Regions:
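Bacterial Sec-dependent N-terminal signal peptides
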Residues: 1-22, 543, 550-551
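Intrinsic structural disorder/low-complexity segments
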Residues: 5-10, 263, 287, 587-589
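Short secondary-structure junctions and interdomain/linker hinges
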Residues: 12, 383, 399, 538-541, ...
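C-terminal PAP-associated
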Residues: 21-525
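Extracellular/luminal regions of secreted and cell-surface proteins that mediate adhesion/ECM remodeling
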Residues: 524-597
């Protein structure tokens, strides 16, 4: 183990020196100010299927037909394990994007509403839902009405809780622009600042993330060659001031992939990132498929972490690979490395796009009291016969550090049963450490039409296992014919206020391509409690031998707690135990204070 850690540190140093990229300052951009305009009926529900031209570069690469497949040592082939979690769909409704190919749905929530956005015939449109019931508040609005250039789509919707602001984004139909609309207040139906950032070429597949510790709103795009990343100044965008726009490029492409993408890491929850943390970007590298980059191995593959260093005074930046984290073997050759056609459907020879090139949006990060977590999910060929499964990975490092010391805490490939493909995952984690993952499913078995399903796990479940039985969010009723485009991404967000409700939007097929918006919550165990906090009552300069400590116990299970046992240890001292009774632990989320002395 010590030898492996030493080697990892050496690789980190070499990659930093080899792959540091300088930036290009593209100028300062000042926003316009505008208000909402409803979308027209033709923008919301096109009568003819609309196919969005993007995923630049795939068509230029010859498909690799070689058949190298190493065993997937973390393949979860059975749906049930010794411990079972469960989740409930609180509500689910049809979303926007009907008959779009692809719809590219995205979703987030504030204290009152949920916003979903998709592609349409005239750029991105979005709908506002009641957060508690899922009822539609505003049927459909067009992002183009918010100002700037005409939009083309690829929307991403994000809510930034520290400032209570909405960020609505898409790319332009001409002029190579990223269009970013920032709400001037917490009201998503109020006025917006609209930024039009001009890129050096068409910014395909834009993905975004916040890094408050670097005062940055960052983006990644596919512009041909290595992925391009951008930095915008967060504090100025929140006030409607002029923002710098800084471009830099990831150090190298992944050979074989025509489409090059890297995903920004986006922080969830109220716990801040460590002071001085810089923006992170993440991608996977299947070294058998890509044959470039280092290190290289015949028995495992890699998660790459790249870090952006920004100088706002000089408007410059660099991006460098800081770490290669070992993961089990993945197989990116789902019908080769570039094909748009792979996933089987019932009753047709038409197959669907597997989206194997990218860590799917988004890559959430959450800070807990004793560690930091990043989640990643992607598609992999589980059997060498073009059946897709979902590889998911949880990276961890100690709390309050910014060093490149991430480790692979756990990983698994979710592909139970036989025949059915699972792809287009979206994953997130709540304040308790519960993980929910939703994805598309399909096979050529009769009735197994393109649908949306989910699984999940609790933090104390066996590592590498999704213990929640696969649950259908919405079942498809028909196969898609005519073209192979399915969706470029799904989106799973977390309620920033209760920090335990997951909001998901994804694609299914019911006579037409449609999207679904749903609210999901992990069910509590029947009898469970957790330590919410601890404190020293009163005031003083230090702890003496008889100092009393208060421990706040929170009920996290569904059964009320009337008594329990609490154990504690100071350093390497003896373990002490106290029996307690309670009349306050009478519902999920209720607390009681137990005093230790």
């Amino acid at each position: 183990m010590q030898k492996r850690l030493l080697q990892l540190g050496l690789f980190t140093l070499l990659n930093f020196l080899s792959y540091a990229q300088e930036s290009e300052f593209l100028g300062n951009f000042t926003p316009t100010i505008s208000h909402l305009v409803p979308a027209t009926a033709s923008q919301v529900t096109p009568h003819q299927q609309i196919i969005k031209p993007n995923f630049k570069g795939r068509e230029l690469i010859e498909v690799d037909q070689s058949n190298t497949h190493n065993p997937d040592w973390v393949w979860q082939q059975h749906a049930t394990t010794e411990k079972i979690a469960s989740a409930s769909v609180m509500w689910a409704f049809q979303g926007l994007g009907t008959n779009m190919s692809p719809p590219d749905p995205t979703v987030d929530a504030d204290s009152n509403v949920v916003i979903e956005s998709t592609n349409s015939g005239g750029g991105a449109v979005y709908r506002i839902f009641n957060k508690n019931t899922g009822a539609t508040i505003v049927s459909s609005l067009t992002m183009q009405s918010l100002g700037g250039s005409a939009g083309l789509g690829d929307p991403i919707v994000l809510y930034y809780k520290p400032a209570r602001r909405w960020f609505l984004t898409e790319f332009s139909s001409s002029g190579n622009k990223l269009l970013i609309h920032v709400s001037q207040t917490s009201n998503p139906q109020g006025a917006y600042y609209t930024y039009s950032f001009t890129c050096t070429s068409f910014p395909d597949y834009p993905k975004y993330g916040f890094c408050e510790s670097s005062d940055a709103f960052v983006a990644s795009t596919n512009q041909g060659g290595p992925p391009t990343v951008y930095a915008m100044k967060l504090s100025t965008m929140l006030t409607g001031a002029t923002s710098p726009f800084i471009k830099t490029t990831i150090g190298y492409t992944l050979n074989g992939f025509g489409f090059q993408s890297i995903t920004p890491v986006d922080l969830e929850g109220d716990n801040a990132a460590p002071a001085g943390m810089k923006p992170l970007f993440i991608r996977h590298r299947d070294d058998e498929s890509h044959s470039n980059g280092s290190p290289d191995s015949g028995t495992n593959d890699w998660i790459e972490l790249w870090e952006m260093t920004i100088n706002w005074t000089a408007n410059t930046a660099t991006v460098a690979k800081i770490q290669d984290v070992v993961i089990g073997e993945i197989d990116s050759k789902l019908c080769g490395l570039t094909s748009f056609a792979c996933i089987k459907q019932p009753g047709t020879t038409n197959t669907l796009d597997p989206l194997r090139e990218t860590v799917m949006y988004k890559a959430p990060m959450r800070v807990f009291d004793d560690h930091q977590t990043i989640l990643a999910a992607l598609a992999t060929d589980v059997d060498g016969a073009d059946r897709a499964g979902v590889r998911w990975v949880e990276l961890r490092r100690a709390s309050n550090v910014t060093t490149p010391t991430w480790v692979n805490y756990q990983e698994g490939t979710y592909a139970p049963g036989t025949g059915t493909s699972r792809w287009m995952p979206a994953i997130n984690i709540d304040k308790f450490g519960n993980i929910i993952m939703a994805y598309s499913t399909s096979s050529n078995t009769a009735g197994d039409f393109p649908s949306i399903k989910m699984t999940g796990r609790k933090p104390c479940d066996p590592l590498g296992q999704m213990t929640m039985p696969e649950t259908t969010i919405i079942a498809g009723t028909s196969s898609k014919t005519g073209d192979t485009r399915w969706g470029d991404y799904h989106h799973m967000s977390i309620d920033d206020f209760d920090q335990k409700t997951f909001y998901f939007t994804g694609v299914y097929h019911n006579s037409q391509t449609k999207t679904n918006v749903s609210a999901i919550r992990m069910n509590p165990d029947v009898l469970d409690a957790s330590i919410a906090n601890a404190f020293v009552p009163g005031t003083g300069t230090g702890c003496g031998s008889s100092t009393q400590i208060g421990v706040i116990v929170e009920q996290t299970g569904s059964t009320n707690i009337t008594s329990g046992v609490l154990s504690w240890q100071v350093g390497s001292g003896a373990i002490s135990t106290v029996n307690y009774t309670s009349t306050q632990l009478n519902g999920v989320g209720t607390t009681d204070t137990i005093y230790l002395s």
